[in-house]
Amino acid sequence: MTRLERRLLIWRENFSGSFSAKVRWRMKHDRNPLLVTVQDKYLVRQWAHARGVETVPLLQMAEDADAFPIETLPPDCFVKASHGCGWNLLRREGVFYEFGNGTAFVDDHGLPQPAAALAARRVDDAACRALWRKWLGQKYLAAEWAYQLMTPRLLAEPVMAQRGNGPQRLYRLFTMQGVVQAIAVGGPVFVRTESDYLVFDRNWTRIRMPGEHPPVDEAVLGERPQTLPDMLEIARRLGSELDFVRIDLFDTPQGAILNEMTVYPSGGQPGRPFVSATHNRWLGRLWKLPGRTRR
């Protein structure tokens, strides 16, 4: 996309009230302090627990990289920053790796890659601490207001298993005032195979879009989760106090578990979250911004 094409797309989205235009409006204008709480990967835990929602367990937390004890971490876990996006490491069999978006860690069917295939992403303990110091000394993108008010922290979390031991999926619930309007199923295998989200309504009816490229294993990856009623209830509890929030859940053997909440999906980039501009406008028009009736 050229710079001119991008500017034209943003203009069209702003004019039509498309979803990304609403995200950009929130980034610029909305200073609701609750946005900070739910976006913070540490604070959102106690906020969710107070509403009866289980989260990914917290193994360790520290505000100082040198106070984060590697020797007490389990051999398999994630270490991430609470105040940013994409700042994460995977520890597997006692070895740290740069995780990124996870695509290097799965094959084209979403199954784990052997350790030999990950050698280029390996990070030793000293490099880990250097990364952690870097993260703790940074603020995430200035345009995303909520991040600027967060206390930098390091978190350790267990690796969550997918119910049924299939490829791990993340269920992104686009929630308006507690009502789920769309569910986008994704995960590392989608990015690896350059596939689009599988999108469903709250009843798990597939929302097909022109130009979409679903994954080859669509039948498996798009299987209706047994915990769908629980997911919708979680979204009601966590989303009812906000005009919009994306609630990201895992479907685990222990049930539906909150991974995180997102108030600025894709950072307001144009042409998101779906491949179809028509559906992006549809989703945007369902989002009623505070003090506004249409846009």
Feature locations, PLM:
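A long amphipathic alpha-helix within ATP-dependent nucleotide-binding catalytic cores
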Residues: A143-P158, D196-A256
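Phosphate-binding site of ATP-dependent enzymes
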Residues: V106-H213
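Short, solvent-exposed loop/turn elements at beta->coil junctions and helix N-caps
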Residues: A62-A67, V159-R163, F250
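Membrane-proximal basic amphipathic "stem/tether" segments
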Residues: M1-N32, R295
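C-terminal active-site "lid" helix and adjoining low-complexity regulatory extension at the edge
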Residues: G17, Q226, E233, D251-R295
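A conserved helix-loop-beta module that forms one wall/lid of the active-site cleft
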Residues: S20-D125, R129-A130, Q138-A143
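Phosphate-binding core of ATP-grasp and ATP-grasp-like enzymes
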Residues: H83, W87-V95, G164-I207, M231-R246, ...
